[in-house]
């Protein structure tokens, strides 16, 4: 996954709103799923697991550039949850 593509945020607009790269869409889907069920362990989601282990630092610097009109996952809560998970594992 090339998360540098998140820097292209805003170059694609569809009926659902503003999105970044495909990688950001994958992250959006995975984290939205996590937030819809806060008690669900991130380790049960392979995408979250992969992102937490490999890309937390990069996402913490860049994910604020990515947005969706239908999602508010880019929040302090998200960062705290993912950071805690990445530290514990």
Swiss-Prot record:
Which compartments is it annotated to reside in? Nucleus
Spell out the family assignment given in the record's similarity comment. Belongs to the ecl1 family.
Of the GO CC terms on this record, one is: nucleus
Q: What induces it?
A: Up-regulated transiently when the growth phase was changed from the log phase to the stationary phase.
The name of this protein is Extender of the chronological lifespan protein ecl3
Q: Which GO terms describe its biological process?
A: phosphate ion homeostasis
Q: Which gene encodes it?
A: ecl3
- Keyword Nucleotide-binding set for record: no
Function noted in UniProt: Involved in chronological cell aging.
Note the Pfam families from the entry: Ecl1
Q: What is its main location?
A: nucleus
Keywords associated with the record: Nucleus
Question: Does the record bear Nucleotide-binding in its keywords?
Answer: no
């Amino acid at each position: 996954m090339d998360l540098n593509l998140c820097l292209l945020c805003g170059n694609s607009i569809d009926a659902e709103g503003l999105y970044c790269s495909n990688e950001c869409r994958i992250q959006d889907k995975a984290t939205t799923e996590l937030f819809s069920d806060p008690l669900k362990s991130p380790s049960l989601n392979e995408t979250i697991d992969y992102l937490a282990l490999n890309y937390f630092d990069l996402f913490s610097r860049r994910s604020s550039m990515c947005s969706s009109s239908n999602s508010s996952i880019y929040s302090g809560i998200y960062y705290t949850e993912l950071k805690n998970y990445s530290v514990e594992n």
